Protein backbone atom coordinates (compact mmCIF):
# COMPACT_ATOMS: atom_id res chain seq x y z
CA UNK A 1 0.00 0.00 0.00
CA UNK A 2 2.89 2.34 0.71
CA UNK A 3 3.90 2.88 -2.88
CA UNK A 4 0.29 3.53 -3.89
CA UNK A 5 -0.12 6.86 -2.07
CA UNK A 6 3.57 7.79 -2.23
CA UNK A 7 3.83 7.35 -6.00
CA UNK A 8 0.70 9.37 -6.61
CA UNK A 9 1.89 12.15 -4.32
CA UNK A 10 5.30 12.31 -6.00
CA UNK A 11 3.67 12.59 -9.42
CA UNK A 12 1.20 15.37 -8.57
CA UNK A 13 2.95 17.27 -5.78
CA UNK A 14 4.86 19.81 -7.92
CA UNK A 15 1.72 20.71 -9.87
CA UNK A 16 -0.43 20.78 -6.74
CA UNK A 17 2.05 23.05 -4.92
CA UNK A 18 2.38 25.39 -7.89
CA UNK A 19 -1.35 25.74 -8.46
CA UNK A 20 -2.74 25.56 -4.93
CA UNK A 21 -0.04 27.58 -3.17
CA UNK A 22 0.92 29.85 -6.04
CA UNK A 23 4.54 28.70 -6.03
CA UNK A 24 6.76 29.06 -9.06
CA UNK A 25 6.89 25.76 -10.93
CA UNK A 26 10.65 25.44 -10.41
CA UNK A 27 10.34 26.07 -6.64
CA UNK A 28 7.47 23.59 -6.36
CA UNK A 29 9.47 20.97 -8.25
CA UNK A 30 12.53 21.55 -6.10
CA UNK A 31 10.53 21.32 -2.87
CA UNK A 32 8.83 18.11 -3.99
CA UNK A 33 12.09 16.57 -5.21
CA UNK A 34 14.02 17.44 -2.05
CA UNK A 35 11.31 16.63 0.48
CA UNK A 36 11.14 12.89 0.12
CA UNK A 37 14.81 11.96 -0.19
CA UNK A 38 16.05 14.48 2.39
CA UNK A 39 13.27 14.13 4.96
CA UNK A 40 12.74 10.46 4.13
CA UNK A 41 16.36 9.83 5.14
CA UNK A 42 15.62 11.34 8.54
CA UNK A 43 12.52 9.14 8.87
CA UNK A 44 14.51 6.04 7.95
CA UNK A 45 17.21 6.93 10.45
CA UNK A 46 14.59 7.53 13.14
CA UNK A 47 12.92 4.19 12.35
CA UNK A 48 16.23 2.35 12.51
CA UNK A 49 17.31 4.06 15.73
CA UNK A 50 13.95 3.42 17.41
CA UNK A 51 13.97 -0.19 16.25
CA UNK A 52 17.48 -0.71 17.64
CA UNK A 53 16.70 1.06 20.91
CA UNK A 54 13.40 -0.67 21.63
CA UNK A 55 13.85 -4.01 19.90
CA UNK A 56 10.29 -3.58 18.60
CA UNK A 57 9.05 -3.47 15.03
CA UNK A 58 5.27 -3.19 15.11
CA UNK A 59 4.90 0.20 16.89
CA UNK A 60 7.38 1.83 14.52
CA UNK A 61 5.64 0.39 11.48
CA UNK A 62 2.26 1.59 12.77
CA UNK A 63 3.62 5.03 13.66
CA UNK A 64 5.04 5.43 10.15
CA UNK A 65 1.66 4.64 8.59
CA UNK A 66 -0.14 6.98 10.99
CA UNK A 67 2.31 9.79 10.19
CA UNK A 68 1.76 9.29 6.46
CA UNK A 69 -2.00 9.58 6.92
CA UNK A 70 -1.59 12.67 9.10
CA UNK A 71 0.78 14.23 6.57
CA UNK A 72 -1.65 13.80 3.68
CA UNK A 73 -4.49 15.24 5.74
CA UNK A 74 -2.45 18.28 6.84
CA UNK A 75 -1.21 18.89 3.29
CA UNK A 76 -4.59 18.64 1.60
CA UNK A 77 -6.64 20.42 4.24
CA UNK A 78 -4.30 23.35 4.92
CA UNK A 79 -2.07 24.05 1.88
CA UNK A 80 -4.48 26.50 0.26
CA UNK A 81 -4.65 28.56 3.46
CA UNK A 82 -1.01 28.29 4.53
CA UNK A 83 2.07 27.22 2.57
CA UNK A 84 4.02 26.53 5.80
CA UNK A 85 1.22 24.21 6.98
CA UNK A 86 1.29 22.43 3.62
CA UNK A 87 5.05 22.02 3.87
CA UNK A 88 4.59 20.66 7.40
CA UNK A 89 2.21 18.06 5.95
CA UNK A 90 4.83 17.06 3.37
CA UNK A 91 7.46 16.73 6.11
CA UNK A 92 5.16 14.63 8.31
CA UNK A 93 4.38 12.33 5.36
CA UNK A 94 8.07 12.04 4.40
CA UNK A 95 9.14 11.12 7.94
CA UNK A 96 6.44 8.44 8.12
CA UNK A 97 7.30 7.22 4.64
CA UNK A 98 10.93 6.69 5.61
CA UNK A 99 10.19 5.26 9.05
CA UNK A 100 8.59 2.01 7.89
CA UNK A 101 11.45 0.87 5.63
CA UNK A 102 13.99 -0.39 8.19
CA UNK A 103 11.21 -2.31 9.92
CA UNK A 104 9.80 -3.94 6.79
CA UNK A 105 13.25 -4.96 5.62
CA UNK A 106 14.04 -6.50 9.02
CA UNK A 107 10.81 -8.35 9.82
CA UNK A 108 11.03 -11.06 7.12
CA UNK A 109 14.45 -12.08 8.45
CA UNK A 110 12.99 -12.62 11.92
CA UNK A 111 9.91 -14.67 11.03
CA UNK A 112 9.76 -18.34 11.97
CA UNK A 113 10.83 -20.74 9.27
CA UNK A 114 12.59 -18.14 7.15
CA UNK A 115 15.87 -18.90 5.43
CA UNK A 116 17.96 -16.96 2.92
CA UNK A 117 15.87 -18.09 -0.05
CA UNK A 118 12.56 -17.25 1.58
CA UNK A 119 13.76 -13.84 2.76
CA UNK A 120 14.93 -13.07 -0.78
CA UNK A 121 11.54 -14.14 -2.13
CA UNK A 122 9.77 -11.99 0.49
CA UNK A 123 11.81 -8.93 -0.50
CA UNK A 124 11.15 -9.61 -4.19
CA UNK A 125 7.43 -9.95 -3.54
CA UNK A 126 7.26 -6.75 -1.45
CA UNK A 127 9.21 -4.81 -4.08
CA UNK A 128 7.14 -6.17 -6.96
CA UNK A 129 3.86 -5.28 -5.25
CA UNK A 130 5.20 -1.82 -4.47
CA UNK A 131 6.30 -1.16 -8.04
CA UNK A 132 2.98 -2.43 -9.36
CA UNK A 133 1.08 -0.07 -7.05
CA UNK A 134 3.45 2.73 -8.06
CA UNK A 135 2.58 2.10 -11.70
CA UNK A 136 -1.17 1.87 -11.16
CA UNK A 137 -1.66 4.77 -8.74
CA UNK A 138 -0.94 7.70 -11.10
CA UNK A 139 -3.29 6.19 -13.67
CA UNK A 140 -6.11 5.78 -11.17
CA UNK A 141 -5.29 9.13 -9.58
CA UNK A 142 -5.52 10.92 -12.92
CA UNK A 143 -8.93 9.44 -13.55
CA UNK A 144 -10.07 10.30 -10.04
CA UNK A 145 -8.77 13.86 -10.46
CA UNK A 146 -10.82 14.24 -13.63
CA UNK A 147 -13.93 12.97 -11.85
CA UNK A 148 -13.33 15.35 -8.95
CA UNK A 149 -12.79 18.28 -11.32
CA UNK A 150 -16.29 17.71 -12.64
CA UNK A 151 -17.67 18.10 -9.11
CA UNK A 152 -16.49 21.73 -8.89
CA UNK A 153 -18.46 23.46 -11.67
CA UNK A 154 -18.39 27.17 -12.25
CA UNK A 155 -14.72 27.64 -11.40
CA UNK A 156 -11.79 28.35 -13.68
CA UNK A 157 -9.96 25.39 -15.15
CA UNK A 158 -7.02 25.98 -12.80
CA UNK A 159 -9.24 26.04 -9.70
CA UNK A 160 -11.05 22.90 -10.86
CA UNK A 161 -7.68 21.19 -11.34
CA UNK A 162 -6.55 22.23 -7.83
CA UNK A 163 -9.86 20.92 -6.47
CA UNK A 164 -9.39 17.60 -8.30
CA UNK A 165 -5.78 17.17 -7.20
CA UNK A 166 -6.57 18.08 -3.61
CA UNK A 167 -9.45 15.67 -3.16
CA UNK A 168 -7.93 12.81 -5.15
CA UNK A 169 -4.79 13.03 -2.97
CA UNK A 170 -6.99 13.27 0.12
CA UNK A 171 -8.73 10.03 -0.87
CA UNK A 172 -5.43 8.33 -1.74
CA UNK A 173 -4.23 9.19 1.77
CA UNK A 174 -6.81 6.83 3.18
CA UNK A 175 -4.91 3.85 1.76
CA UNK A 176 -2.63 4.51 4.71
CA UNK A 177 -5.50 3.47 6.99
CA UNK A 178 -5.40 0.01 5.40
CA UNK A 179 -1.63 -0.06 5.87
CA UNK A 180 -2.03 1.07 9.50
CA UNK A 181 -4.58 -1.67 10.17
CA UNK A 182 -2.22 -4.25 8.65
CA UNK A 183 0.62 -2.90 10.80
CA UNK A 184 -1.53 -3.25 13.91
CA UNK A 185 -2.44 -6.85 13.02
CA UNK A 186 1.03 -8.05 12.08
CA UNK A 187 2.86 -10.23 14.57
CA UNK A 188 5.69 -8.54 16.47
CA UNK A 189 8.98 -10.11 15.43
CA UNK A 190 11.27 -8.04 17.66
CA UNK A 191 12.43 -9.02 21.08
Predicted regions and their residues:
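A late C-terminal transmembrane helix in Major Facilitator Superfamily
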Residues: 113-151
Amino acid sequence: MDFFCYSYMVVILPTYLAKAAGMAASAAGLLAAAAFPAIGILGSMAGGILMSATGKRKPILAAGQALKLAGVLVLTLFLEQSLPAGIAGIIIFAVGNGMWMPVMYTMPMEMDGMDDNRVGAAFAFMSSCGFLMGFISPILGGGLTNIMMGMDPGQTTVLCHVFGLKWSLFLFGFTNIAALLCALRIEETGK
